[in-house]
A protein has these predicted regions:
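Charge-rich amphipathic alpha-helical interaction elements
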Residues: 1-122
Length: 122
């Protein structure tokens, strides 16, 4: 009985840990997206300020060029994290299925114990 309770707690902890990981990655994606949007705004403002919007132009602002590079890096990171989210969600679903399996097993074992106890009383 004791080891079964410990095992159930372990499985619940694993499910929660997987859930936390998914939320953490989703939070990172949201933050990176916000930062990319801010950089887009800054790029537009810098291009307006200088009057040059062609990145191939020789006098294109260095700040805008650096902001574009940073934004592109953020977008690549977002793409990578999106893949990680899918993997983390799959791991969470797997852990949830395993927990459900152990919970149903525990329910069956408790039902058997109750049946044995009630039969012993008769």
């Amino acid at each position: 009985m004791k080891s079964r309770d410990t095992l159930m707690r372990l499985k619940r902890f694993q499910v929660e840990e997987k859930r936390r990981r998914v939320r953490q990655i989703e939070t990172m994606v949201a933050e990176f997206t916000r930062m990319a949007i801010d950089l887009d705004r800054e790029i537009v403002n810098e291009e307006r300020r200088t009057g040059i919007s062609d990145p191939a132009h020789f006098a294109y602002p260095t700040y805008a060029r650096a902001a574009i590079a940073r934004r592109d890096n953020l977008k690549r990171s977002i793409d990578d994290l999106t893949g990680q989210i899918e993997q983390a969600k799959a791991a969470e679903e797997e852990a949830q299925a395993e927990l459900a399996k152990y919970e149903s097993l525990e329910g069956r074992e408790k039902a058997i114990e109750r049946a044995v106890e009630s039969a012993a009383r008769l």
